[in-house]
Amino acid sequence: MGERRKTRQAEVNIGMVGHVDHGKTTLTKALTGVWTDTHSEELRRGITIKIGFADAEIRRCPNCGRYSTSPVCPYCGHETEFVRRVSFIDAPGHEALMTTMLAGASLMDGAILVIAANEPCPRPQTREHLMALQIIGQKNIIIAQNKIELVDKEKALENYRQIKEFIKGTVAENAPIIPISALHGANIDVLVKAIEDFIPTPKRDPNKPPKMLVLRSFDVNKPGTPPEKLVGGVLGGSIVQGKLKVGDEIEIRPGIPYEEHGRIRYEPITTEIVSLQAGGQFVEEAYPGGLVGVGTKLDPYLTKGDLMAGNVVGKPGKLPPVWDSLRLEVHLLERVVGTEQELRVEPIKRKEVLLLNVGTARTMGLVTNLGKDEIEVKLQIPVCAEPGDRVAISRQIGSRWRLIGYGIIKE
């Protein structure tokens, strides 16, 4: 067992989504043993700001047949058998962090929508996160009705009916609703079995050219490190197709900004992979699933503080095109999501500035042209994306960016 565990990488990414304080991080801890809020400001404010990843092994007990994430069955004490390793993406539920949640959503193969039983459903971010899943086309959804320890049976049933009503007509209409207490670990086995039943590992072709979406980037050198001990910049993200190997030459697009004739342009860069980390282990090869850390020969100055977030990594010459402007086939929602009162979505106007999320990248787009169900936008920061990719569209309403629909990239 120990040997297999060493080389094991998560094979599926599952998003934890839902309203702030409904228990996403607590549930991630119940499933993985890892508290994903490790950013100092997060611990102080008690909310998730950056996206957290934590892996768990799904295991089944051959004796009683129940599922858990522990090597010894918590129900009968028998040794459990490994089924697969999954990675949980803990996405921020706070409204100001919605664009971060969208970046994480682009890496999800399925999602657990956490809804607290002790509050009326839906709350603004519950609605907003479900809309985000709808926009990225995510259908593999489980609903965890959390905090049932705080309500009586009547209240829990009333909340269940509200959830049923809320998901009617959405991608989550047929999602199982599982009552749990993340705090006390109650019914977690039922939730783990639902993950097995409703969130399959996607079929992937390892021979496709590799493509990794960058979510974070770091300078891992401590201040005062002597020059000969400095290591190159590290990129953190998720491989969405193909595989990466230590020693591979990689290209990063759109790359790094430089100034030319008073305009900011971007230049793709190439470098070499010197190390790979997956599931907390150094590995020689990394595949889709989980968060992968890619050690490079890049100057760490380029990667510090998430500067490379939103880039795409692949083999030189094999990456999708970089776009300075996009033509989008637009699908607007009827109502703005995330606001306390429901507002109608007004049509997009020429010269309007929109916030666009493409994969893990986010950029501003100035609307230069309008057609029937189509817009053209000039991008502030170029993006690397395929024709046919989905783009989440947000508009500034009051002081916040609000999700108003999505676009599909046209040639």
From Swiss-Prot:
Its EC number is 3.6.5.3. GO terms for molecular function: GTP binding; GTPase activity; metal ion binding; translation elongation factor activity; translation initiation factor activity; tRNA binding. One of its GO terms (biological process) is formation of translation preinitiation complex. CDD domains: eIF2_gamma, eIF2_gamma_II, eIF2_gamma_III. It comes from the Archaea. Keywords: GTP-binding, Hydrolase, Initiation factor, Magnesium, Metal-binding, Nucleotide-binding, Protein biosynthesis, Zinc. It catalyses: GTP + H2O = GDP + phosphate + H(+). It is an enzyme of class 3 (hydrolase). Residues 46-50 are annotated as: G2. Pfam families: eIF2_C (PF09173), GTP_EFTU (PF00009), GTP_EFTU_D2 (PF03144). Residues 146-149 are annotated as: G4. Zn(2+) binds at residues 61, 64, 73, 76. Mg(2+) 2 binds at residues 21, 46. Mg(2+) 1 binds at residues 25, 48. Residues 9-203 form the tr-type G domain. Residues 90-93 are annotated as: G3. The keyword Acetylation does not apply. This is Translation initiation factor 2 subunit gamma.
